Amino acid sequence: MRDVWYSSSYLLDRKQSMNGCAKARFENYKMQPVEFAFMPEFKGKLSQYGITPDRRTPSGIRAAIIREKGTNGEREMAYSLYLAGFDVKDVTMTDLISGRETLEDVNMIVYCGGFSNSDVLGSAKGWAGAFLFNPKAKEALDKFYAREDTLSLGVCNGCQLMMELNLINPELKKKGKMLHNNSHKFESRFLGLTIPTNRSVMFGSLSGSKLGIWVAHGEGKFSLPYDEDKYNVVAKYSYDEYPGNPNGSDYSIAALASADGRHLAIMPHLERSIFPWQNGCYPADRKNSDQVTPWIEAFVNARKWVEAKMKSVSYTHLRAHETCADL
């Protein structure tokens, strides 16, 4: 019955989707269920992470959302960071270009999703140019990444920006690229992600999980010049075939992290999936009891990492002061 209902859509899709994707979608739509596998310690409660939506006092842990003309995912991202315990500031490219903002007082920056500069010349090309060809913005970015107490996250358009600026794998001679989806269509759907064992600040504790997440992009294909083992892969689409792999990414990669695990670029929108009610589907035995999904843990991990760094720096300064006093 469902095949009969779907057949008209398939006939229309054949005239729109490229590279045989319409046929693959029709053949696989009922073969790729979104699977969930949570870590045993996940309870689904805010109290598990010591967080509350009612917080009204600053935590002192600062994150900045960086946005450009056409960014449209900053509200969900700001709330995800706030709920996890960050104090969040809004930074526009104009702030960086003019020198009003230097990023010196923040430990985490996030590039949000959207369509910066309407994707003219390609996704994130103009946004990258705003950093590369404006001295004050470039200086702020370079100084931020030169520090050892910083994290960064790029989602969707922000992921494309990080790849364009070569912020994830600067140690490799050849730079990876983000290309148009194989279907040559904008892909928007709720699908499954698998988190492999990985060494990253945000996703390390989620290793072994299978989670649902939203994708919404037209140029989300990771095209990578080296073998998979050269990269710190932190998330994969749960299926290699379209539409489970919505863009044809090499090795079914959905997210990459830097070699040290501090900087993460991901195409799907984890900030749009932190609550069960945001998910297109969720385990029936948990959807009425869980307050949050495991995706919130990624943001909490980031906040805890920064907290630990700040305490370490404070302790080092204290010991240095005591040593000077003893002399």
Kindly label every feature range from the protein language model:
Residues 104-109:
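Short acidic/histidine-rich motifs immediately flanking catalytic phosphotransfer sites
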